[in-house]
Amino acid sequence: MKQPIEEARDLFRAILSLDSEEECAAFFEDLCTVKEIQDLSQRLQVAAMLNGGEKYQTIEQTTGASTATISRVNKCLVYGSGGYRLVLDKQTESK
């Protein structure tokens, strides 16, 4: 796994310090714009759908994501540092 950029360490630690979904929502509402939160959420949804074998066209229609976004997420799933897969696996385990 790649080492996180130094400037982001405090951010990652801050996120890890949160105890609940409510605390996380409050933090992200202060940290990000509504659009940024929507974009991040959309990417995670795209990753889940790609991981589930959905086709680009279905993902585009369901999520409203552009093919460029879908391609970028797919590239991260295939060649990235494993973050999407880690989160998707953890979400599957917690269901």
Predicted regions and their residues:
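Short, Lys/Arg-enriched anionic-surface-contact patches
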Residues: 23-42
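Short, solvent-exposed alpha-helical "recognition" segments
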Residues: 75-88
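Short alpha-helical "recognition helix" segments of helix-turn-helix
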Residues: 58-63, 70
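Short, amphipathic alpha-helical "recognition" segments used to contact nucleic acids or chromatin
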Residues: 40-54
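General nucleic-acid-binding
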Residues: 1-18
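Intrinsically disordered, low-complexity basic tails/linkers immediately adjacent to helix-turn-helix/homeobox/MYB/SANT
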Residues: 87-95
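Major-groove recognition helix of helix-turn-helix-like DNA-binding domains
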Residues: 46, 70-78
